[in-house]
Curated annotation (Swiss-Prot):
GO cellular component, one term: cytoplasm
Biased composition (Gly residues): 7-18
Catalytic residues in the record: H247, C303
Bias (Pro residues) ranges: 20-56
Biological role: Involved in cell death (apoptosis).
Protein's name in the database: Metacaspase-1
GO molecular function: cysteine-type endopeptidase activity
EC number, as in UniProt: 3.4.22.-
Gene source species: Cryptococcus neoformans var. neoformans serotype D (strain JEC21 / ATCC MYA-565) (Filobasidiella neoformans)
């Protein structure tokens, strides 16, 4: 595996939409909730985190600009390890690297074979069409300052620009909650992106806990730095890809945007000392800075990952917004408010908020309202997650190799049916898992979308 270029650099805010800084209460309130918090190695399918990880004795750092630390980033033009850093690169965190206790044994399971490829999936008629290139306006016209009217919008990416990917696989070798298939998942997704979608190896950053380069170890600091790299310099029609396979869990929600009262988290290799990474932070880093028309595709193969990227539009297998998780009326009204915030139009923002019906405002104690106000985006962000927020995700064996069930199902579904719409792909992924696992993969988006158009990345 190569990591020839890691521009790194700080996170650049490109116009917030309803952005609000995270609350100051960053101290963790004990370990994550107890149910279903881990999984053990195969052969029988197991769930991520059947047992909770040890209590984390740490205090979350005080929030800095945009809710993440920017320490460690320095301007440089020199070689470090086996890759180059460009102007705006970062220096890896100080301290001894995590010791790997094993050697990498190959790219993991063999991708599905023997099944003839078809033009389209069995769900729906005919091949889906590509997404439209023009901006997609929807919802009511809003009156802004100066008497100008505006309408909320988003823009699909054509995925014809720069392609970058970040693949993270953490097996937690030597720990009481060790996994078997996550490193395989990261390498298989990397291979799939190169062969199927034309990504270049030099534009894919790999973080796995068998890496020998300390900057490729999936510590909390390295994961956050790589997330910043992924979105730095993003432009319309770029295609960015984020894949995470490892432990996931939940922690009490501190800012009131979760209707179940819990934020979703992922666990870096050094979570016992450095802490987990919360969905709010992942959204702030990887979604908020993206311009309209830039694609980010995320895959979370972990427990409790249904809304791990905090995208407010969750879709059913029929291709419609789920109820009561997201009401279209609330989504439209609060996206309007967010777009007014983006334009600096506080009057339009308030008008958009007030336009939401009382029935919607009273549901879920305001959590849905806050999420839609602050988490909608004109960028083209899609997340595929291995299960609902309340479910666990399996670490198992497929084709004789250890793997995460979601990572395998995603590759298998697109190998069998390369030309699929979003709703077709959601159904074929679920078909891959049906009868073997209880988990139900989820599709969520940063904007209301037509799920019958072609999935591209």
């Amino acid at each position: 595996m190569s990591w020839n270029q890691y521009p790194g650099g700080g996170h650049h805010q490109q116009g917030g939409y309803g952005y609000r800084p995270p609350p100051p209460q960053w101290a963790q309130q004990g370990p994550p909730p107890p149910p279903n918090m881990g999984y053990r190695p195969p052969p029988p399918p197991q769930a991520y985190y059947n047992n909770p990880p040890p209590p984390q004795q740490y205090q979350r750092p005080a929030p800095q600009q945009n809710g993440y630390q920017q320490g460690g980033y320095q301007q440089q033009q020199q070689s470090q390890g086996n890759y180059r850093t460009s102007n705006g690169g970062y220096v890896p965190p100080t301290g001894a690297p995590v010791e790997a206790s094993y050697h990498h044994t190959g790219a993991g399971y063999t991708p599905p074979s023997g099944t003839p490829q078809r033009t389209s999936a069995p769900y729906g008629a005919g091949a889906p069409i590509r997404p439209p290139s023009q901006a997609q306006h929807y919802g009511p016209q809003l009156q802004g300052q100066g008497g100008q009217s505006a309408q909320p919008y988003f823009q699909y990416s054509q995925c014809t620009g720069k392609k970058k990917a970040l693949c993270i696989g953490i097996n937690y070798v030597g720990s009481s909650s060790a996994l078997a298939g996550c490193i395989n998942d990261a390498h298989n997704v990397q291979k799939f992106l190169i062969e199927r979608y034309g990504y270049k190896s030099e534009d894919i950053v790999m973080l796995t806990d068998d890496a020998r380069n300390p900057r490729q170890i999936p510590t909390r600091a390295n994961i956050l730095a790589a997330m910043h790299w992924l979105v730095q310099g993003a432009q319309p029609n770029d295609s960015l890809f984020f894949h995470y396979s490892g432990h996931g869990g939940q922690t009490p929600d501190l800012d009131g945007d979760e209707d179940d009262g819990y934020d979703e988290v992922i666990y870096p290799l050094d979570f016992k000392t450095a802490g987990h990474i919360v969905d709010d932070d992942m959204h702030n880093i990887m979604v908020r800075p993206l311009p309209a028309g830039c694609r980010l595709t995320a895959i979370y193969d972990s427990c409790h990952s249904g809304t791990a990227l905090d995208l407010p539009y969750i879709y059913s297998t029929e291709g419609v917004i789920k109820e009561p998780n997201l009401l279209a009326e609330a989504g439209q009204g609060l996206l309007s408010a967010g777009m007014s915030y983006l334009r600096g139009d506080t009057g339009g923002m308030l008008q958009g908020i007030m336009g939401i019906g009382k029935k919607v405002m009273n549901q879920n104690s305001g959590a849905m309202e806050k999420a839609r106000q602050t988490k909608t985006s004109p960028a083209d962000v899609i997340s595929w997650s291995g299960c609902k927020d309340s479910q666990t995700s399996a670490d198992t064996q497929e084709a004789g190799r250890a793997t995460g069930a979601m990572s395998y199902a995603f590759i298998a579904a697109l190998t069998k049916y390369p030309q699929q719409s979003y709703v077709q792909l959601l159904n074929t992924i679920r078909d891959e898992l049906k009868g073997k696992y209880d988990q139900k993969p989820q599709l969520s988006a940063s904007h209301p979308m037509d799920t019958n158009i072609l999935f591209i990345c």
